[in-house]
Amino acid sequence: MTTDQLPAELERVHMVGIGGAGMSGIARILLDRGGLVSGSDAKESRGIHALRARGAQIRIGHDASSLDLLPGGPTAVITTHAAIPKTNPELVEARRRGIPVILRPAVLAKLMDGRTTLMVTGTHGKTTTTSMLIVALQHCGRDPSFAVGGEMGEAGTNAHHGSGDCFVAEADESDGSLLEYTPDVAVVTNIETDHLDFYGSADAYVAVFDAFVERLAPGGALVVCVDDPGAAALARRTAELGIRVLRYGSGPHGQAPSGEPLAATLVSWQQQGTEAVAQIRLAGEQQHPLVMRLSVPGRHMALNALGALLAAIEIGAPTEAVLDGLAGFEGVRRRFELVGTAGGSAPSSTVRVFDDYAHHPTEIAATLAAVRTLLEQSGGGRSIAVFQPHLYSRTKAFAEEFGHALDAADEVFVLDVYGAREQPLAGVSGASVAEHVSVPVRYLPDFSAAAEQVAAAAAPGDVIVTMGAGDVTLLGPEIVTALRVRANRGAPGALR
């Protein structure tokens, strides 16, 4: 049975860092469920403007007095330990007043109470797979509540309080917070070592997925992509615990590489421009393969969709309706998102600029593979990768792997490291990545000059893709503008 009644401690909350992707989503749901919300953040943003329009009281900057934005003060203060230091004056004041300080994952878990919970995790593809599942269920008339790490194209938001009986959310593995949840269905897209700054070792990182799956509700199921070795190993360990496992992938004859039957098989996949058509087969169905159409390119996207399909079917959604919903999925912001074009109308006479959140070597490889297929189908042109490493610790750990992944482009520009919450590490910079790239590469430590230099390298038919989890996303529009300026003045080197 679902209810809109909020737990007493969440009826009036103050949120420190309210503008972040995860925090703003929680704020939306609390407001939609009748809660009173105040908050603070370091700077204005579109998300903060949207929350104010919904009734949230938000102050820019951090000060102890912000806890008085709500009449009577908050019943709880919500924060995220990854981004907000314990010395934040609002957190210090909350502790002084005896106001409970609750971390975002614990709040999300409380908001899921009473609903069938579907959660997606994995090293890569979490946000896209979660969003695909949401869109599919919406198309089936389920109106799920949801919280996702990126802005969905269809909804224009990252969270929603729905009238349905299910809740779909992304489970972030980066800091172990996924262990707050007890899902009915867990989707694991892949497992590949990451976030060593938090876990310290690959074994510790892998272990958190086992712990998460062991938290499945009684009768729950693991939906897992066994094309990925790490996820396939998790599937075997989970099955040994007696937990139901639904495997998907592209193994021959409907079997995983290790011989287990697949619940869903990607029989074939073909990219058609920026769209794709896949042939899939579900276990126990002997008819011809089903057709799955997608509006997003890349084989990895087809596998993500297959995981979303299985999860939706698991809670009773009709297969054909789910496939129809997936066909209408428009993507997630910053997941191979077309930023703009410059030049003529035909692919051979224009430069297309895309932006992607890829910040791990495997994600870069998948994105550049999609670019390569796009170029092959449009008659040629070159791929130009613009990569901004994210976190000094990750750059140090994967500098060589980043370089090898970027070799799939024809030309590469490497920006300096976006440190986010980390302090610089001696000897670690964008140059650490660039020195491992074997195709033509330039290291651009001056972000302000990058757009013009990238634009100068482009020619008609080329595809430029900016990649990274930092502010490299701001560069795409600047590149498009620079390309158009060069075209209008007939500058050599671009759109010639």
UniProtKB/Swiss-Prot annotation:
Disulfide bonds: none
Main location: cytoplasm
GO BP term, example: cell division
Annotated compartments: Cytoplasm
Catalysed conversion reaction: UDP-N-acetyl-alpha-D-muramate + L-alanine + ATP = UDP-N-acetyl-alpha-D-muramoyl-L-alanine + ADP + phosphate + H(+)
Molecular functions (GO terms): ATP binding; UDP-N-acetylmuramate-L-alanine ligase activity
GO terms for cellular component: cytoplasm
Binding positions for ATP per the UniProt entry: 122-128
The keyword Cell division belongs to this UniProt entry's keyword annotation: yes
EC number: 6.3.2.8
Family per similarity comment: Belongs to the MurCDEF family.
Cited function: Cell wall formation.
Name of the molecule in the record: UDP-N-acetylmuramate--L-alanine ligase
Name of encoding gene: murC
